[in-house]
UniProtKB/Swiss-Prot annotation:
Gene: atp19
Protein name in the entry: ATP synthase subunit K, mitochondrial
Organism of derivation: Schizosaccharomyces pombe (strain 972 / ATCC 24843)
Alphabetized UniProt keyword annotations: ATP synthesis, CF(0), Hydrogen ion transport, Ion transport, Membrane, Mitochondrion, Mitochondrion inner membrane, Transmembrane, Transmembrane helix, Transport
Alphabetical list of Pfam families matching this protein: ATP19 (PF11022)
Keyword Iron-sulfur among record annotations: no
Biological role stated in the UniProt entry: Mitochondrial membrane ATP synthase (F(1)F(0) ATP synthase or Complex V) produces ATP from ADP in the presence of a proton gradient across the membrane which is generated by electron transport complexes of the respiratory chain. F-type ATPases consist of two structural domains, F(1) - containing the extramembraneous catalytic core and F(0) - containing the membrane proton channel, linked together by a central stalk and a peripheral stalk. During catalysis, ATP synthesis in the catalytic domain of F(1) is coupled via a rotary mechanism of the central stalk subunits to proton translocation.
Compartments (UniProt record): Mitochondrion inner membrane
Main localization category: mitochondrion
Membrane-spanning residues: 13-35
Membrane topology: Single-pass membrane protein
One GO biological process term: proton transmembrane transport
Signal sequence interval, chain numbering: none
Quaternary structure (record): F-type ATPases have 2 components, CF(1) - the catalytic core - and CF(0) - the membrane proton channel.
Length: 68
């Protein structure tokens, strides 16, 4: 049995692996709950477009609207 000493306490290998797996899978869920985007992006929030033609600009704006 492997025992690791961290900050003066002893932990077994399975305890460390469960802690790592828990932080990997639960951490992003907690982060997404805490830092949720409150309002959708508006047209002002879109960076300036460097389209070469009006059609290209319309295509980009349509794509952004569909994939919000």
């Amino acid at each position: 049995m492997s025992v690791y000493t961290i900050a003066g306490r002893q932990f077994q290998a399975h305890q460390l692996s469960l802690a790592v797996l828990g932080s990997v899978f639960v951490g992003p869920v907690i982060y997404s709950k805490l830092f949720k985007r409150n309002k959708p992006l508006s047209a002002k929030d879109v960076p300036p477009l460097n389209a070469k033609s009006k059609e290209e600009e319309e295509f980009i704006l349509k794509y952004i609207e569909e994939h919000k």
